């Protein structure tokens, strides 16, 4: 079965399910735009010079020039809008799910009381897999439609658009929330839970795995036997496995202490207290600290699988926080005394 048919069946299955209000890639409609462009190009090649009058009577929907201005406007504008909506929907749904799994404050108390009566573990795992399948299906749809665009036009505009999506932080398979959801999937030991009920028969997402024992710790998402995505769990600053990780708005991950050091703020002040002009140490984007995300599920995964390493880093961070706190209050005391 071709991907287009699989994708349409997936959309039909989602009409009455958890993701019914989420945006999806209009794969069929975008294919029609490219098909019109292909027809227009064929007509141009068959009638290079002599049929000006016939060309004037053609439908305005058919792409009639090599630059494909109309096609590009319809295609890339629509795809950008859809990718942005999907990324926003995915991040909000994942955030809501993970807040239930690792609650804080009064919500944690309510959640523990609720667990005495109802075990929501399997429901949460099912929702997690639905979200993984949702983002995977749409990411593959975007990749295939861009590949088809480049094939029809003999260009690299589709490939360039993928790079632009990464720059605009709407590349679905590079989202920090996908890493968080993968960590949640591993933390729940979902392979031991009955996953046969309520899942899609056309499920593209296969599995997440994590290896922290190698010199380069990785999390791997398998979509198929041949398609796998790897996510580095190494901090770009200390070059060690991430500890108490934070994801900046640009998508890059750092240890909390490393991110605070890069932004010239104290650890106890937090990553979000960084000044607006602070730049990401990797991509040099500014304004990326204000909306940084604490990767609680990833931190829990590393804590569970590398207990000795996590305890050692915790001691080191606490010692550094005590040292920085002393420096801060000493400087405040000197300022108050006018020294």
Curated annotation (Swiss-Prot):
Enzyme class: transferase
PROSITE patterns found in the cross-reference section: SPX (PS51382), ZF_RING_1 (PS00518), ZF_RING_2 (PS50089)
Keyword Transferase attributed: yes
Biological processes annotated in GO: protein ubiquitination
Molecular functions (GO terms): transferase activity; zinc ion binding
Source domain of life: Eukaryota
Zinc finger (RING-type): 235-284
Matching SMART domains: RING
Catalytic activity field: S-ubiquitinyl-[E2 ubiquitin-conjugating enzyme]-L-cysteine + [acceptor protein]-L-lysine = [E2 ubiquitin-conjugating enzyme]-L-cysteine + N(6)-ubiquitinyl-[acceptor protein]-L-lysine
Keywords per UniProt: Metal-binding, Transferase, Ubl conjugation pathway, Zinc, Zinc-finger
Boundaries of every SPX domain copy: 1-163
Transmembrane segments: none
Record bears the keyword Metal-binding: yes
UniProt EC number: 2.3.2.27
Pathway: Protein modification; protein ubiquitination
Domain writeup: The RING-type zinc finger domain mediates binding to an E2 ubiquitin-conjugating enzyme.
Family: Belongs to the RING-type zinc finger family.
UniProt-recorded name of the protein: Probable E3 ubiquitin-protein ligase BAH1-like 1
């Amino acid at each position: 079965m071709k991907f287009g048919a699989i994708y349409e069946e997936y959309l039909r299955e989602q009409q009455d399910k958890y993701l019914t209000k989420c945006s999806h890639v209009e794969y069929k409609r975008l294919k029609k735009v490219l098909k019109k462009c292909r027809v227009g190009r064929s007509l141009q090649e068959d009638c290079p010079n002599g049929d000006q009058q016939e060309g004037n009577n053609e439908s305005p929907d058919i792409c009639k020039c090599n630059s494909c201005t109309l096609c590009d406007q319809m295609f890339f504008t629509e795809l950008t809008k859809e990718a942005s909506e999907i990324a926003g929907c995915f991040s909000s749904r994942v955030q809501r799910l993970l807040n239930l799994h690792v609650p804080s404050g009064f919500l944690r108390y309510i959640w523990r009381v609720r667990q005495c009566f109802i075990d929501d573990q399997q429901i949460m795992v099912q929702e997690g897999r639905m979200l993984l399948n949702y983002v995977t299906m749409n990411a593959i749809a975007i990749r295939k439609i861009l590949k088809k665009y480049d094939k029809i036009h003999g260009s690299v505009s589709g490939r360039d658009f993928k790079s632009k999506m990464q720059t605009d932080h709407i590349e679905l398979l590079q989202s920090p929330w996908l890493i968080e959801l993968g960590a949640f999937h591993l933390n729940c030991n979902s392979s031991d839970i009955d996953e046969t009920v309520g899942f899609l028969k056309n499920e593209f997402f296969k599995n997440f795995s994590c290896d922290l024992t190698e010199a380069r710790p990785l999390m791997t998402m398998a979509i198929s036997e041949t398609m796998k995505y790897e996510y580095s769990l190494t901090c770009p600053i200390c070059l060690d496995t991430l500890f108490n990780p934070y994801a900046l708005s640009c998508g890059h991950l750092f240890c909390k202490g490393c991110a605070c050091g890069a932004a010239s703020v104290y650890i106890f002040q937090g990553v979000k207290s960084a000044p607006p002009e602070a730049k990401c140490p990797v991509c040099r984007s500014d304004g990326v600290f204000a909306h940084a995300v604490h990767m609680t599920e990833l931190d829990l995964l590393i804590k569970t699988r590398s207990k000795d390493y996590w305890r050692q880093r915790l001691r080191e961070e606490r010692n550094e926080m005590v040292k920085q706190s002393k420096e801060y209050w000493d400087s405040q005391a000197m300022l108050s005394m006018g020294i």
